[in-house]
């Protein structure tokens, strides 16, 4: 009887999982292939992730970047901290290596007309086996800052596992420490697998961030700074759920996410035009 019950439960679990898998995760990818990757990565241990701990990415003031950010090299940084810092955690994955979608969204951010005197748009780019544009290397993770001439690299590190919570918390701490502002927000860009599988597919380290790891990363950065993000946005599929919201609630006032799939090219970043110099901050 027990064996029969267990068999029924396994069958039910498979039937429940199939519709999720078939929906895919970003239309321009192969649905079964993407979720096979996510399921595989979710089942692996973090032996590769542990090898990257403490190296490369900025973590705390006691462990500074080996190449301090040359922030005063850019005139556009003179007014840092007046309004807000938006941090974009850009896990390129096959969305970039196969389709160039991450590069496309960086183009959209550049042409949105952001008032860079009052808004810091900071990107941490990695997790792709190849970059179609931008001259980025799969052997590195790169910090990009939006300036009046477009994105410029302000810091680079040896390739970090973007499915490691230490990498995400390191990037957030980097933003807090070097780009102080009145408010902060975070965009998480890549594949999403919902509350069961988590977010992000780093195709170099074959790893992703589970909800527990997202919570760990936020606690070690947002929580440690005793601040709260204005919003966290998932430019990723399937991340709008009560389970995800409950994890983010202590760390952000708002969550922006989709309960369904998204197109491969993700959000239309023209919405950043609301941060143009024609818009009065606070209105």
PLM region spans:
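Bacterial N-terminal signal peptides that target proteins for export
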Residues: 3-13
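Bacterial N-terminal signal peptides
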Residues: 14-21
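N-terminal extension/subdomain marker
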Residues: 34, 39-180
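Structural recognition of the beta-strand scaffold that forms the well-ordered cores
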Residues: 85-90, 120-125, 184-188, 230-234, ...
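Solvent-exposed loop/turn segments at secondary-structure junctions
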Residues: 92-96, 127-131, 190-196, 203-207, ...
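A short, glycine/acidic-enriched catalytic loop
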Residues: 152, 192-224
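Active-site-proximal C-terminal subdomain of hydrolase catalytic domains
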Residues: 227-283
